[in-house]
Amino acid sequence: MTTGEVPDLLAFDDAFAQDRHNRYARMREEPVQRIRTVNGLDAWLITRYEDVKQALLDPRIAKDFGRTQQIIEKRLADAERRPGFSPDLGPHMLNTDPPDHTRLRKLVVKAFTARRVEGLRPRIEQITDDLLDRLAGRSEVDLIDEFAFPLPITVISELMGVEDSRRDDFRSWTNVLVDGSQPEAQAQASVAMVEYLTELIAKKRTEPGDDLLTALLEAVEDGDRLSEGELIAMVFLLLVAGHETTVNLIGNCVLSLLGNPDQLAALRNDPSLLPGAIEETLRYESPVANGTFRHTAEAVRFGDVVIPEGELVWVALGAANRDGERFEDPDRFDITRETTGHVAFGHGIHFCVGAALARLEAQIAVGRLLERFPDLRMAASPDDLRWRFSVLMRGLEKLPVRPGA
């Protein structure tokens, strides 16, 4: 790369999604560098493990949706582009720092305690078994479409108190929103999502229940601190993050196991290794590849590189989790590996509030799938599988499998 050259992720396009780990390996050679994102925005990408952890903890690399949005809109205007993502979906706890982050997170964290999550186990097992019943006797199925997606969307919908009758629409909107390369389609999906959430909230006001959405509404009604805009953004975050990460985690885990027969055999011989298989998947094929945008509130130094004030910053979680300085033989899938410290769910105050739920869903899903179908195997060559084109997410478009008898 010549001096001053800005790597252009748009030029990589779909090839980047299909070859992400090799691209990240090359980027880690220059671990803090300026890049051009898929929508033409210049930003800084941080790829090494220690730098990523530093960035996730440094308050100078801020989550302030209003300020970040100003930077984005200014740069897009300078480039004669327009943003696709609706600002109505942005002011949630993932895009804010304290004190707003503290009060927003406080409203939902009690719904995701270890005790509350464990209480969901029987229902998650029931949903899982019902889905597996539908796979039995089939010669070939798409495991993403018929298992990895419907399980978490059903769980989060029930937790939130939301009917999942429009889940296909919701999935379509989410796919566009996490893509980022289609600003016009993203704008349309944003409008549709805001309209859907507004209707959803209005209906829940008249038909409250024993669910998380009602709890959030009552907090607003009781004079707590959620504005209408914050409520829409919070519900958006919980519904999207509450299923998207887990869809990818389940799919990536099954793919990694089927692609590494020795590890699959080890797990079948010793089911107590299942939690380790989930953690290794989180490291090896991190379902969230990059965090959402941050910005520098002041200049920040990483080694010899100084990121000036007012710059957009991305932390590459997936790249950090394949850093050989932190994980020995990082490109090997090993379910007995000590994975403590991976950053698949983030680090610091923005650590994923739903991590325990995602882990539980994945353990139940993968464990019961392998138990139910001992002859489960791939129905396509690994070279024929395609990764979704998303700068944020790492997940397959489809995962064809043959369940067996």
UniProtKB/Swiss-Prot annotation:
Q: Which GO terms describe its molecular function?
A: heme binding; iron ion binding; monooxygenase activity; oxidoreductase activity, acting on paired donors, with incorporation or reduction of molecular oxygen
Q: What is its EC number?
A: 1.14.-.-
GO CC terms of this entry: cytoplasm
By its UniProt entry, which Pfam families does this protein fall under?
A: p450 (PF00067)
Cofactor(s) annotated in UniProt: heme
Which top EC class is named for this enzyme in its record? oxidoreductase
- The keyword Iron is annotated on this UniProt entry: yes
Could you tell me where this protein is found in the cell? Cytoplasm
Name the SUPFAM superfamilies for this protein.
Cytochrome P450 (SSF48264)
Query: What InterPro entries would the database entry show?
Result: Cyt_P450, Cyt_P450_B, Cyt_P450_CS, Cyt_P450_sf
PROSITE patterns on file: CYTOCHROME_P450
Keywords, sorted A to Z = Cytoplasm, Heme, Iron, Metal-binding, Monooxygenase, Oxidoreductase
Positions contributing to heme binding? 352
Family label:
Belongs to the cytochrome P450 family.
Which PANTHER family does this UniProt record tie to the protein?
Answer: CYTOCHROME P450 YJIB-RELATED (PTHR46696:SF1), P450, PUTATIVE (EUROFUNG)-RELATED (PTHR46696)
Relate the protein's function as given in its record. Not known, probably involved in the catabolism of octane and guaiacol. It displays a weak activity in the O-dealkylation of 7-ethoxycoumarin.
Q: What is this protein called?
A: Cytochrome P450 107B1
Query: Which species expresses this protein natively?
Result: Saccharopolyspora erythraea (strain ATCC 11635 / DSM 40517 / JCM 4748 / NBRC 13426 / NCIMB 8594 / NRRL 2338)
